[in-house]
Amino acid sequence: MAIERTFSIIKPDAVAKNHIGAIYNRFETAGLKIVAAKMLHLTKEQAEGFYAEHSERGFFGALVAFMTSGPIMVQVLEGENAVLAHREILGATNPAQAAPGTIRADFAESIDENAAHGSDALESAAREIAYFFSAEELCPRTR
Ligand code: GDP
Ligand code: MG
């Protein structure tokens, strides 16, 4: 088992509904440790840059509008096979198809506003972590 780091966003809908603590509890219950965290209100440019891979999709404008609609929490999670472990507790992109007990099944209303983000691979995790955090902001959990 490899210790990995992955990147998480609690999106504006879940922050607005006061679900930050409940979602952090899901991370910790799954054995994922938070090694960096902060609240941000994304600019249009930040949201467009983060989701650049989707810039040609029909939903891109709606996605950027949603992601800039209120504050978010961004965090780095560390643990065994963290990328996959985090995607598993997150659930499918469309909450209507997310497995019972997953974050998106329990906290999201629709594919447009689906509560949380998780990196889909180690490479995207490294890129997404670096998009929001400097190396000095990551706090190894050695104790
Ligand atoms: P994820 O990795 O599970 O978040 O899914 P994707 O990388 O495929 O899409 C990124 C984000 O774009 C999703 O989490 C949704 O917020 C949004 N998204 C994806 N598909 C749709 C769609 O059909 N309509 C809208 N409005 N948003 C979508
Ligand atoms: Mg994705």
Swiss-Prot record:
Give an example GO molecular function.
metal ion binding
Query: According to its UniProt record, which reaction does this protein catalyse?
Result: a 2'-deoxyribonucleoside 5'-diphosphate + ATP = a 2'-deoxyribonucleoside 5'-triphosphate + ADP; a ribonucleoside 5'-diphosphate + ATP = a ribonucleoside 5'-triphosphate + ADP
InterPro entries assigned: NDK-like_dom, NDK-like_dom_sf, Nucleoside_diP_kinase, Nucleoside_diP_kinase_AS
The places in or outside the cell where this protein is found are: Cytoplasm
What EC designation does it have? 2.7.4.6
Question: Pfam families under this entry?
Answer: NDK
Which cellular component terms (GO) are annotated to the entry? Answer: cytoplasm
Checking SMART domains in the record gives:
NDK (SM00562)
Indicate which residues the UniProt annotation says bind ATP.
K11, F59, R87, T93, R104, N114
| UniProt keywords, alphabetically | ATP-binding, Cytoplasm, Kinase, Magnesium, Metal-binding, Nucleotide metabolism, Nucleotide-binding, Phosphoprotein, Transferase
| Record has Hydrolase as a keyword | no
Domain of life (superkingdom): Bacteria
Q: Which cofactor does it need?
A: Mg(2+)
Per the Swiss-Prot or TrEMBL record, the active site comprises H117 (pros-phosphohistidine intermediate)
Q: Which PROSITE patterns match?
A: NDPK (PS00469), NDPK_LIKE (PS51374)
Subunit structure and binding partners: Homotetramer.
Write out the function statement from the record: Major role in the synthesis of nucleoside triphosphates other than ATP. The ATP gamma phosphate is transferred to the NDP beta phosphate via a ping-pong mechanism, using a phosphorylated active-site intermediate.
According to its UniProt record, which protein family does this protein belong to? Answer: Belongs to the NDK family.
Name this polypeptide is given: Nucleoside diphosphate kinase
